[in-house]
Structures are given as C-alpha cells and as structure tokens.
C-alpha cells in the first residue's frame, strides 16, 4: 500500500472519476467475501450509502465463485440507528428504499445512550470526546445486529480522511495543505474512527469491514491530484465520489452535506451530553484538572467526565498516554486549526462548529 505522503508525488496527477468508481467497486467486491451472514451499516450519509449501493449490486451472487452461483443469503440487510426523527434515519430509509435493501431502523433514547457510556468507554478504551460520542450509538446498534445473527457488516469509515470530507477541509488554504492533512488523518485513524468501528462492533462479536480503507483502493485514491479533492468556500466536499456514484443513489443523498455520525444520529444527543457533563463536572474540578490528570489534562468538562470513567477502568499512566488529547474542530488535527483564525479559540469536534459551512451550525462559538 502506498499512502503517498509527499505532495510532490501527486500534485501533477490526474483525478479521474472513472478510476475512483472502478477501484471502490472492486474494493467492496473483495470485502464481501464471507461465509457468514453479512449486512451494511447505512447511516444515510454519502459514504455508507455508496458502500451499501455497491454491496447491493453484488449481494445476489457468491463472491467466492466469482458470481457463478447464487448467494446463500441474497437479501442484503441494512442497519441504521438514531434518535427518533434524526436526520440520518430519514435519509437511510430513503436510500434503503431506493437500492432495495431489507432495512432495519433502530431508535434509541438519550437515556439509553447515557446508560451505556460507562460500558462503551470500557470496550473502546479511550476518553476521546468525539469517539465516545459516536461509539455509543454504534455500540447499541451492534447489539441489535448480533441478535439478528449477522456476523459481518460493511461500513463507510475512511472516506472523510481519504477525500477530505470533514467540513473543516473547506478552509484548507492550498492543495498541499489539504493533501498533508489527509495523510495526517489517515495516520491517526486507528485512534479514532477505526477504533470506534472496530471496538464498538467487536464488543458484540460483529466484524466490521471498511472498503474505503482497502489497500488497493487507497493506492488509487491517495494518488489523485489533491486539487480535485478540494472544496473551497461553499463547494460541496467529496465531489469526485459524488460524481462517481450519483447514478446509484437518490439525488438528495448523493449531494447531501457531510454530517458526522455523532451529529447525524440526532443533534440532541451531543447537546444533552454537553449539558449533562457540564452539570456533572464543577468549575472547581476543572480548575484542578491538571492535579488530578497531569497526563493529557482534560480540555473541557465533557472530556473530564469521560476521563474519570476511563480512569476507573484503566488507572495506569500508560493507559492515559495511549489516548490522543488535542484541540480539534470538526475532527481536525491540531495542525489544521491554523487554517482559520476562527478555529484558534475553539475545541469542538462536532461539524456544527464550522460556522459559515455547516447548514445547522452552532449560533455561538463552542469552546
């Protein structure tokens, strides 16, 4: 696999939509090889919808026989989770009907999520705020998937890192900055989204596979000219992926703005977490946070709350050091905070922190 660290090695390359389409379809085809019942995680966002649509294309035939025989379970099952009326649930339902999957919609309540957080932190082994936020609904979803006898699911993780899909990428000043940030994001993925998907699912014995991170696909995707991936100003992110698969998806989904998983399951999930943790952690505790947690001192009350639970499960210093703890806006690296002066006083991983880009952005700065 070649991640193409150097901008110089890719800056003059082509960026063909057909190359992306062929490489991703091949990746999904490879990842579908399985002797157990499988399904797809369908959030209703672009990435999971693309993976689901491609999987549906191949689901009727056995991959192991190169399509020469019928699949043992030809009906593709898709799964979505969210608070009642969540943006993701509405779009996932639309995609499932369009591509023809057997769709399962799981509603959870904020209280169910809160009740699960202690177990979630134990299984995912991190106190990173965005990972805990997103892992909780995925953990609850995996429980349902396991109960139905599904052993493996395909998921859309990795696309935002490869194609610069997070909303803060709109602020990338140059193609070089854009490309170098995608490389940084990929190099840290095992501490964030891959950790979430792997451990939230495996806690219930479900295997997750991620075609966007297929090695052969990465060879193609990371060699694309970074300029073609950029989304300056109001341009939509991941345009090359949208153009490649627009004919396989409802138009409203193919051109839907990026919504992070922890936002898409329902805005009130994150808002309630912030309220609960703000009430649970006092100002005095935050003032003395460095005394209690000298390693990776929590940057806000929500992180302090998760860190306290983490310490109960994993009290050693080495465990604390294993978790990244840096300021972030919409899942950015610390380096990308320099892209916009408005980022410099922020520390909020939600995409709604990118004011002027997210359609439902916070009215005020979140610190």
Residue ranges of predicted features:
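Non-catalytic nucleic-acid substrate-recognition regions in nucleic-acid-modifying enzymes
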Residues: 283
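Short, small-residue-biased leader/transition segments that mark boundaries at the very start
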Residues: 1-3
